[in-house]
Amino acid sequence: PVNEAGVERLFRALVGRGCPADCPNTCDSSNECSPNFPG
């Protein structure tokens, strides 16, 4: 099973910088809001 909290924390650490204001911690590598994470 996936540890969602751990995955989200890693995701934020990797791509959480330079994201749009409406989803500053949940964007993908293109700085778009990621549909796979709550934002």
UniProtKB/Swiss-Prot annotation:
The keyword Transcription does not apply. Keywords: Amidation, Disulfide bond, Neurotoxin, Secreted, Toxin. It is found in: Secreted. Expressed by the venom duct. Residues 1-16 form a propeptide. The modification Proline amide is found at P38. It comes from the Eukaryota. One of its GO terms (cellular component) is extracellular region. The keyword Ribonucleoprotein does not apply. One of its GO terms (molecular function) is toxin activity. Contains 2 disulfide bonds. The cysteine framework is XIV (C-C-C-C). This is Conotoxin Cl14.5. The lineage of its organism: Eukaryota, Metazoa, Spiralia, Lophotrochozoa, Mollusca.
